[in-house]
From Swiss-Prot:
Its EC number is 6.3.4.4. The gene is purA. Gene3D superfamilies: Adenylosuccinate Synthetase, subunit A, domain 1, Adenylosuccinate Synthetase, subunit A, domain 2, Adenylosuccinate Synthetase, subunit A, domain 3. This is Adenylosuccinate synthetase. GO terms for cellular component: cytoplasm. Substrate binds at A300, V301, T302, G303, R304, P305, R306. SMART domains: Adenylsucc_synt (SM00788). Its cofactor is Mg(2+). It comes from Actinobacillus pleuropneumoniae serotype 3 (strain JL03). Pathway: Purine metabolism; AMP biosynthesis via de novo pathway; AMP from IMP: step 1/2. Belongs to the adenylosuccinate synthetase family. The lineage of its organism: Bacteria, Pseudomonadati, Pseudomonadota, Gammaproteobacteria, Pasteurellales. IMP binds at D14, E15, G16, K17, N39, A40, G41, H42, T130, R144, Q225, T240, R304. Homodimer. Its main location: cytoplasm. Keywords: Cytoplasm, GTP-binding, Ligase, Magnesium, Metal-binding, Nucleotide-binding, Purine biosynthesis.
Length: 432
């Protein structure tokens, strides 16, 4: 009997999901993206060679894996072609191994233009989007005016719909935001050129998944961003536009929740966040700067520096609740090497003096929140590239154990470096 495993971020994204997905894909037949778009940057380092995937599932680097893009993903045809070209230039067969749901909403140039115009108008109050049109494309989906992959293959009807939508967007862009309009004919010509290339990759992803389940093969669902950026459960409004949580697997692929056997939450040994929004344990001192330097904390897609802070058990407890997390993979343990002491946030002190152990939902409810820390001894030994648990310093083992106690879920995988081999699998999600 095959197993179905979801891998998702349990913090604010950038936890190291891509590496872990790639590591576990030697056990699976299918890897599935079910939400987000090319705003996700999944960095893989294999034999010293770095690959950043934004849209195509991380399983594409394994020859025996078929990659699926589910209906919950907003698809930029332009970004897809660029990423395919980069992979094919390295001899990777993409076209025969990538299937795309016909129900994926399309990201088109007017979505990108609107994204940039809005962020510029918001100034210092901006959300901190990646500027790739993700939010506007999801808006069109919910407003039922969006174009989908299936629309690409009726060119006459597509052109009519595009004209109506572009009139709507260009009116706002020109008259409200005072920026240049998006050209209809260029948009049409560009997208039709790409449509002819991807036509053979379009499939009924939901049916493929259910057939795979019947055949008893292993399936891996690859989440993007992180739990605290979920449109419903994150620090709203400083969130992404999709459901980054385990529930997104069902809605974004058509694979029902009872079919999931294991949910692997990815956590860093500390916390990071990109862009605006609440971050209770953020460090503004030399310690924070040192974590950022040692952890190379810059966004894989945007290049933006990440905000760094101590591990926040309060926020991660919320992630455990929302996702029914079975076990954790802790990444970047080695970044904490050499610190004399480490801190873990165990509770929040609210502005009214109340002590809480679960994170608030809305961003406004985080205002004035103070972290309550527990201090633990650090370690001077090197954990980089350690692949046996018994070779870790006792202080590192104690740190991991304390986090397990605080969040109520075991750490089943430990990552001590960027390469796929620099990992300890303590409990295999596909054998659990």
């Amino acid at each position: 009997m095959g197993k179905s495993v979801a891998i998702l971020g349990a913090q604010w994204g950038d936890e190291g999901k891509g590496k872990i997905v790639d590591l576990l894909t030697d056990r699976v037949k299918y890897v599935v993206r079910y939400q987000g778009g090319h705003n996700a940057g999944h960095t893989l380092i294999i034999n010293g060679e770095k690959t950043v995937l934004r849209l195509i599932p991380s399983g594409i680097l394994r020859d025996n894996v078929t990659c699926l893009i589910g209906n919950g993903v907003v698809l930029s045809p332009e970004a897809l072609m660029k990423e395919m070209g980069e992979l094919e230039a390295r001899g990777i067969n993409v076209r025969d191994r990538l299937k795309i749901s016909e129900a994926c909403p399309l990201i088109l140039p007017y979505h990108v233009a609107m994204d940039h115009a809005r962020e510029a108008a918001l100034g210092k109050n901006k959300i901190g989007t990646t500027g790739r049109g993700i939010g506007p494309a999801y808006e069109d989906k919910v407003a039922r005016r969006g174009l989908r992959v299936s629309d690409l293959f009726d060119k006459e009807a597509f052109a009519e719909k595009l004209k109506d939508i572009l009139d709507y967007y260009n009116f706002q862009l020109v008259h409200y935001y005072k920026v240049e309009p998006v050209d209809f004919q260029k948009t049409l010509d560009d997208v039709f050129a790409i449509a002819d290339v991807i036509k053979g990759m379009v499939a009924d992803v939901t049916t493929l998944l259910h057939q795979a389940r019947k055949e008893g093969v292993n399936i891996l669902f690859e989440g993007a961003q992180g739990t605290m950026l979920d449109i419903d459960h994150g620090t709203y409004p400083f969130v992404t536009s999709s459901n980054t949580t385990a529930g997104g697997v069902a809605t974004g692929s058509g694979f029902g929740p009872r079919n999931l056997d294991y949910v692997l939450g990815i956590i860093k040994a500390y916390c990071t966040r990109v862009g605006s929004g609440p971050f209770t344990t953020e460090l503004f001192d030399e310690v924070g700067a040192e974590i950022a330097r040692k952890g190379n904390e810059f966004g894989a897609v945007t290049g933006r520096p990440r905000r760094c802070g101590w591990f926040d058990a309060v926020a991660v407890r919320r992630a455990v609740q929302i996702n029914s997390i079975s076990g954790f993979c802790m990444t970047k343990l080695d970044v904490l090497d050499g610190f004399e002491e480490l801190k873990i946030c165990t509770a929040y002190k609210m502005p009214n003096g109340e002590i809480v152990e679960y994170a608030p939902m809305a961003a406004k409810d985080w205002e004035g929140v103070e972290p309550i820390y527990e201090t633990m001894p650090g370690w001077s030994e090197n954990t980089f590239r350690v692949t046996k648990r018994e070779e870790l310093p006792q202080a590192a083992l104690d740190y991991i154990k304390r986090i397990e106690e605080l969040v109520g879920v075991p750490v089943d995988i430990l990552s001590t470096g960027p390469d796929r081999v620099e990992t300890m699998i303590l409990r295999d999600p596909f054998a659990a």
